[in-house]
Regions:
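Residue-level signature of mid-helix packing/kink "hotspots" within the transmembrane helices
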Residues: 2-10, 93-94
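Structural signature of the two symmetry-related core transmembrane helices
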Residues: 23-38
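Paired small-residue
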Residues: 46-54
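Intracellular juxtamembrane helix-capping segments at the cytosolic ends
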Residues: 60-74
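Multi-pass alpha-helical transporter architecture, strongest
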Residues: 119-138
């Protein structure tokens, strides 16, 4: 997970000037959705483990991409904007696992059900990128 997350960030760092951030984030969101579905629905633990690694690849750009998009959209956002982004990140880093844990507990400790519920987060990111695109076009 961590190695592929770092590889994703390094790839975008090297080739980002040639790649659309929106497109990269959309493709990463789709890969993240697919990896969450694979983790939660595949019956072979080995394939679920591969999906966990792919999840790392898919999430690598999400946090730095969000910062880049925010800085581009609000160039005078300053310290307050980054403080709010950090707060949002903290809420997400605690809220996501909390949701997964609650759903898992509702299903008798079935972590696969919790991970399946967690698919809502990359779906929300996908919707957010689409809304930003739509707002930019108008």
């Amino acid at each position: 997970f961590a190695v592929l997350m770092g590889a994703s960030r390094a790839f975008y760092g090297k080739y980002g000037d040639r790649i659309s951030l929106d497109r990269f984030m959309v493709l990463s969101s789709l890969l993240c959705i697919a990896s969450y579905l694979g983790i939660s629905l595949l019956g072979m633990p080995q394939l679920s483990l591969v999906c966990c690694a792919l999840c790392g690849l898919s999430v690598g750009i999400m946090w730095p991409g969000t910062f880049s998009k925010a800085a581009a959209a609000l160039p005078k956002g300053g310290t307050a904007m980054f403080a709010l982004l950090a707060l949002g990140g903290d809420v997400g880093c605690s809220g996501g696992p909390t949701l997964v844990g609650f759903v898992s507990e509702l299903f008798g400790g079935d972590l696969k059900k919790g991970i399946l519920a967690g698919v809502v987060f990359p779906v929300l990111l996908l919707l957010g990128v689409a809304l930003c695109r739509k707002g930019k076009e108008e």
